[in-house]
């Protein structure tokens, strides 16, 4: 079975101080992917970072809340995490195992932190991983633009040396076509 992970799409990640690259496009792409995943009886999982007083994102604060631009359905699952790796000391792997999920579409924020760490963790656990190259975002960094960060990580994920070829980096349109074939 397939699942969509939507990582850290929280209000505190999307502020005037931390504008995210092409966030409207990324939000629309995530919504489109979520719609088709639901239509083929896959699972949609929101990964929500639970922070602390020092780093922010305290549970039940406004910055911790999921952004309203990403549509959430009642059957979607929220899994809480406290580290960049969505698997680390969370209920994610247990939920995936209980639901016989072996294929993950990974999206969200930030490309160079939680998205990258979760992708690499998932591959080390032998999940088949698909990354929509236009389904994750970040902000400008001190020595590199957000666009360059995203391009760089899309290239890295496409070229990782793994025992299995288990990362596919595709555009949202190609991914939707691929998922549509699973529906038939």
Residue ranges and their predicted role:
Residues 2-8:
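Short, hydrophobic/glycine-enriched beta-strand segments
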Residues 3, 32, 57-184:
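Active-site-adjacent betaalpha module
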Residues 12-16:
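Short acidic, Gly/Ser-rich segments with clustered Asp/Glu that frequently serve as metal-coordination loops
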Residues 18-46:
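A short alpha/beta connector and helix-capping loop motif
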Residues 49-50, 109:
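Short, well-ordered beta-to-alpha junction loops that form the rim of enzyme active sites
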Residues 54:
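Phosphate-coordination/substrate-recognition cap region in phosphate-metabolizing enzymes
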